[in-house]
């Protein structure tokens, strides 16, 4: 079956790796791994244990697992922080009224993705203030404000990693360690650079969530949760199908020491966040390719593609600016004439044939943003033609 059989018209995705537009093209090796994995059966717990060992070898972390997306990894990570190895707590989630349930977060790091954390039963507590945004000064959230917000109900700290995040993660981790609290980092879109896969854990974060799609080019509905052995193990237990016989099941020694887990947990709060064996093998293959040295060529290819688009638009009198980032995917800013409404141009592109979706982050500045990550070679000329048909 094809999309057209369902009456769905494929689009040109010039917006990037966003989930709402299907993400980036799956790496060809990941697609082959997906197909191969479908041909046999495996025990998912054993597969996740093997995955953890491989992630530990590649990324020099204690442990890791594959989740059904970065948001799922955040929910599982939160559940691990809230419940630890306590089976009674696992059983009661998301009811957390009888134990510490608050996660601190800088006020300017809150977003709709808070849902992924609150879904496990955590209460989000915003700390500090951003006087830059309010126009009241030059200060943002500072480390001491985290410390001041800690109470007996504090279970951990949630940190959203971007280049502009403040305070720096290292400073937040320092405060957390001083108070014996774990830090969960949302780094969903923070690769490239590949170094972040190691760096954030090396800084001392207890759990870090990454997307397995986006630039990694694994299945879009996959994610990585990296971190400490016991917390990753707790997250795994709360996701796995636990419908085994208690007499036949043992807590995996790869995650837990003797006596850590006193019995077999029932299905956990993450049961609905399961990930298939095919997706696990596909994202692991994509990650393996992403970690290869020649992976840097992907950014060069994106840059070259944008240069081609820019040259064609410039030749037709359209102003553009190619923004190259050392550690991030390059972008092309396409400037709209003053006599046109950028929002109308964007909407017309979506309604054109072929339908074209561009980045909308700078529409209020009369700029269309082009990201090359999901643009196929055979879409370049139709994309250029569509842009020129709408920009006067």
Please report, for each region that a protein language model flagged, where it lies by residue:
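A non-catalytic, amphipathic alpha-helix used as a structural packing/dimerization or gating element
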Residues: 50, 54, 301-308
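Flexible, glycine/charged-enriched surface loops at secondary-structure junctions
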Residues: 44-49, 63-65, 247-249, 292-302, ...
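Conserved PLP-enzyme active-site core in the AAT-like
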Residues: 2-21, 25, 52-278, 283-288, ...
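Conserved C-terminal alpha-helix-loop-beta "cap" of PLP-dependent enzymes
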Residues: 2, 310-386
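A structural motif shared across PLP-dependent enzymes of the aminotransferase-like
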Residues: 19-31, 41-50
């Amino acid at each position: 079956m094809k999309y057209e059989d369902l009456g769905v018209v494929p689009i040109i995705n010039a917006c990037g790796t966003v989930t709402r537009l299907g993400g980036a093209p799956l790496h060809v090796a990941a697609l082959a791994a997906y197909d191969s994995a479908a041909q046999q059966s495996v025990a998912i717990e054993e597969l996740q244990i093997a995955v953890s060992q491989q992630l530990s070898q590649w990324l020099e972390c204690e442990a890791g697992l594959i989740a059904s997306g970065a948001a799922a990894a955040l929910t599982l990570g939160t559940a691990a922080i809230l419940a630890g190895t306590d089976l009674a707590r696992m059983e009661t989630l998301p009811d957390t009224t009888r134990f510490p349930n608050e996660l601190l977060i800088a006020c300017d790091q809150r977003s709709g993705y808070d849902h992924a954390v609150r879904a496990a039963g955590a209460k989000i507590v915003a700390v500090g203030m951003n006087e830059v945004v309010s126009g009241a000064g030059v200060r943002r959230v500072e480390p001491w404000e985290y410390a001041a917000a800690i109470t007996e109900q504090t279970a951990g700290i949630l940190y959203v990693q971007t280049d502009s995040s403040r305070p720096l993660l290292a400073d937040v981790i320092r405060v957390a360690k001083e108070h014996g609290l774990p830090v969960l980092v949302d780094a969903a879109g923070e690769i490239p650079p590949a170094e972040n896969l190691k760096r954030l854990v090396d800084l001392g974060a207890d759990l870090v969530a990454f997307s397995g799609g986006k630039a990694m080019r694994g299945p879009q509905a996959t994610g990585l949760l990296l971190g400490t052995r016991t917390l990753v193990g707790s997250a795994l237990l709360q996701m796995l199908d636990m419908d085994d016989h208690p007499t036949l099941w043992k807590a995996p020694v790869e995650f837990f020491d003797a006596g850590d887990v006193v019995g077999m947990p029932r299905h956990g709060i993450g049961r609905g966040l399961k990930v298939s064996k095919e997706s696990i093998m596909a994202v692991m293959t994509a990650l393996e390719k992403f970690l290869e040295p020649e992976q840097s060529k992907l950014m060069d290819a994106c840059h070259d593609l944008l240069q081609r688009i820019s040259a064609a638009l410039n030749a037709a009198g359209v102003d553009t600016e190619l923004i190259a980032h050392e550690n991030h995917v390059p972008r092309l800013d396409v400037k709209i004439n003053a006599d046109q409404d950028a929002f109308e141009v964007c909407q017309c592109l979506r309604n054109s044939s072929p339908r074209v979706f561009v980045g909308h982050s700078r529409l209020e500045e009369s700029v269309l943003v082009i990201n090359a990550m999901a643009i196929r070679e055979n879409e370049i000329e139709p994309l250029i033609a569509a842009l020129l048909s709408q920009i006067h």
